[in-house]
């Protein structure tokens, strides 16, 4: 669904694990990585769209996640000129998104990238909370910064004040440190 200004209504999903790391996925057949996201259909509310996209792209059903929070309003990004399809109607110039932060209550084994005819992703990993800012395609970076910044407080609410677990290379939580305010490096555990 595209609004009157040319923005496609969309949901973005930040899936976190118990260690405060986030799900990061590589687009099928490409080198780019991103959070799961997808369009909102006509007569579909954002929550329903989020659960549908979560299943289609990540294979997770609602019983395997907990909604922690969502952004208060819409976050927007504009597509670079070369990605705008001028001959399509209605014209889409970008995305207008509600972002969610979820906690995985199931296990990594519940994540399946093959739940749709054309999978969106072909690989995934857990990364440090701020890592996506250094890795996402440039035109989505500001929206990612806004979503991560707004939703960080909600994620921290269930943890010791100002701390998140940090994992060693084996994926075991080793210590508590203050939550970083700057992007940090990638995870070593990739699927």
From Swiss-Prot:
Region (Disordered): 162-191
Domain Nudix hydrolase: 6-149
Position of sequence motif Nudix box: 38-59
Co-factor(s): a divalent metal cation
Entries under SUPFAM superfamilies matching the protein: Nudix
Enzyme class, UniProt record, top EC level: hydrolase
EC code: 3.6.1.-
GO cellular component: cytoplasm
Family to which the UniProt record says this protein belongs: Belongs to the Nudix hydrolase family. RppH subfamily.
Role: Accelerates the degradation of transcripts by removing pyrophosphate from the 5'-end of triphosphorylated RNA, leading to a more labile monophosphorylated state that can stimulate subsequent ribonuclease cleavage.
Protein name per its UniProtKB record: RNA pyrophosphohydrolase
Species name: Methylococcus capsulatus (strain ATCC 33009 / NCIMB 11132 / Bath)
Organism classification: Bacteria, Pseudomonadati, Pseudomonadota, Gammaproteobacteria, Methylococcales
């Amino acid at each position: 669904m595209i609004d009157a200004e040319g923005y496609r209504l969309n949901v973005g999903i930040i899936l976190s694990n118990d260690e405060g790391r986030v799900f990061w996925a590589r687009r099928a057949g490409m080198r780019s990585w991103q959070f799961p996201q997808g369009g909102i259909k006509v007569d579909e509310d954002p929550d329903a769209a989020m659960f549908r996209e979560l299943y289609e792209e990540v294979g997770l059903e609602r019983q395997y996640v907990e909604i922690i929070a969502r952004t208060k309003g819409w976050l927007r990004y504009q597509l670079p000129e070369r990605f705008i399809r001028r001959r399509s109607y209605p014209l889409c110039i970008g995305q207008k998104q509600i972002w969610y932060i979820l906690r995985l209550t199931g296990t990594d084994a519940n994540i399946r990238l093959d739940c749709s005819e054309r999978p969106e992703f072909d690989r995934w990993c857990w990364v440090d909370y701020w890592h996506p800012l250094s890795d996402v395609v440039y035109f989505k970076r500001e929206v990612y910064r806004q979503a991560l910044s707004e939703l960080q407080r909600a994620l921290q609410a269930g943890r010791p004040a100002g701390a998140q677990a940090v994992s060693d290379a084996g994926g075991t939580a080793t210590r508590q440190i203050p939550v970083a305010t700057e992007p940090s490096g990638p995870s070593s555990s990739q699927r």
